[in-house]
Amino acid sequence: MYPLRAALLCVAVLSVPIARAQIPVDTVRSFMSFRVEEDSLEGALLSADHDITYVLSGVPGSFVYDFGAFAWPTAWSVNGLSPQVAQLYFGPIPFNDLLTGRPRYDLLPTALLRYPKIDPGLPGAVVGIQTELRTADTRKPHTQLHYQAGAHGLQRVTALHAQQTNRLFGLPGKFQGLFAYSGAAVAGDYPGSRLRRQRQLLLRTRYQQYTWSLELLYLHNQRRLGAHSGVLGAGEARYNRLIAQVSGESRTRRLVRNDFLSTLTTRFLIASVYLSTQSLYYEGVGAAARRLGATVQRNFRIGRHRLHVRGDAYTQRISSGVALPIGHSASSIEVQVRDSLQFKTGYLLAQGIMRQQNGDWAPGGRLRWESTLSSIRPYLELSHSAAPSPLTGWGEYLVDGMAESGSITQASGGVGLHMGRFSVQPYGFVANAQNAPDYREIIIDSVQVVSDTYTTFGAGIRLNIASEPERGLYATLNSAMTGTGETKLDAGCLFPEWFSSGRLGFKAVLFTGDLRLNASVRGRSWSAMISRALHAPTGLLVIPSAERTPVDASYALDLVVEGGIRTATVYIIYENITSGTRLMSGNELVPDYPLPAQQWRFGVYWPIAN
């Protein structure tokens, strides 16, 4: 614990304001100014999606284990790796579950986010996902309203208000405040899948002077969600909602999470301190945890070199519950140095990482080369990282096995060709996991910690036909073929051998710009696979047991119509339109959890400058 305390003390010392420092102009202006593309129809559509995994599905080599419903533990996998290796960040806060370690996409304030960025170099990450809040122009008071209604009694509302004052209590500088609230409820497609409560509260305030700024943020989440263990029966009977039954219909998962963040920004460094608390319970079994962490970042520029130095540390303790021993602790310290060397035609990025997790030190690194040669943009990336530590217990629902300290090495590359509105990018990847921790289902609702050694590989292509800024035809396609070498666990095909996703649409502007239309069809398809099973007590996606029914090859189509009326956006989404028809009885991506059939949603997104 002494190295961790020393690291936190260093953060506190570095957090002292530096006299006469000057914040770059871009930093000052970027705090609360809406980017144009974020206030467009595409930005509004991000608010309409269940979570950010729909956006992540466009990343080369990625696949989404989807449930098609709000608040369910949808998981994103890339390069054939376990979904648990992804490290999600909300600003500088690690946003994986404090207890189970899975990324909590469902707890993000989705309607208020910028588009996520993939960064394998984030602390603690094999694959990192960085998310940030959208910002609002507060020179005038600003309000956003977002309402959704849909099938199975869906009701969802999000409201945001932000404003600014140049003086408060006689103090110089700018005070900027933001308040947002979100609530949702839905009956669910099957018994035992009801979202009984979803509440979210976001508060952010910022005090800014010319030389420095201090920001405080608070995010609160509550969830109470049905947690059945799968639809019973075999064949087409499982897709008949009138007669289908589920296992564990009355069971629920309950969660409360609070995140507090303080960030000091100067010209020389950015220092953040955060406190996260969380409780998670399933049928009386659960625990509560508290995590205290800090981050310090500094950028340098030496000639063509752009250096970025970052230090992260946290300590965590189980404060109550029966799923894990009270007082059980975990800690992490990580130091990174990143150098980006600029060339006339591209750049070379090198990153070195040293990480201590629960007392064990492990090195890591990343190397990326990217170039622009006329209309050709090749890239190549290599990375090596320690595998994340597994959950060590969850009462009777998890058996602690022998999990060794593992590592994961990845290589990917591709070539982008851009010709006017058309672009094409063939790509390939290979990943090798050595003794990577995972979870294997023994029987339904009971899993064991295991470690696996395997190699995955694949190749794919991305096509894009861009529309004009506000009108015309557009199309996107992301298709890949994958394979897995011999595995120590002989787990079978957890990832489809081929899968694709795409969108075809048309934009139009009518009545001299007062009405903007965007109509499209979204689709995805996948091959037969064993897939990953849902462990209902924790929400983890695990290697399934023989009791699970394999997933058949199938597809899903969605119809999306958006209309921009002055500043407001109205949209209708009709999801999985062929399921439950003569074309197909049903489909699923996670064994025994069919995707909702012919599910519609209606929404209104309305930013107001008041």
PLM region spans:
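Short acidic/polar hinge/loop motifs at secondary-structure boundaries
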Residues: V64, I93-P120, A136
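Transmembrane beta-barrel wall of Gram-negative outer-membrane proteins
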Residues: L154-A185, Y190-H228, Y239, E249-I270
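Outer-membrane beta-barrel "beta-signal"
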Residues: L595-N610
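Short loop/turn motifs that connect adjacent beta-strands in outer-membrane beta-barrel proteins
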Residues: A136-P141, N166-F175, Q208-T211, L264-S272, ...
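Extracytoplasmic beta-strand/coil segments of soluble accessory domains associated
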Residues: I23-D26, T53-P94
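Flexible loop and strand-edge segments within Gram-negative outer membrane beta-barrel domains
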Residues: S213-G293, I326-S332, S383-A387, L398-G401
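Transmembrane beta-strands of outer-membrane beta-barrel pores
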Residues: P120, Y147-A151, G183-A187, Q209, ...
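Short strand-turn segments of transmembrane beta-barrel domains in outer membranes
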Residues: G128-N166, D189-P191
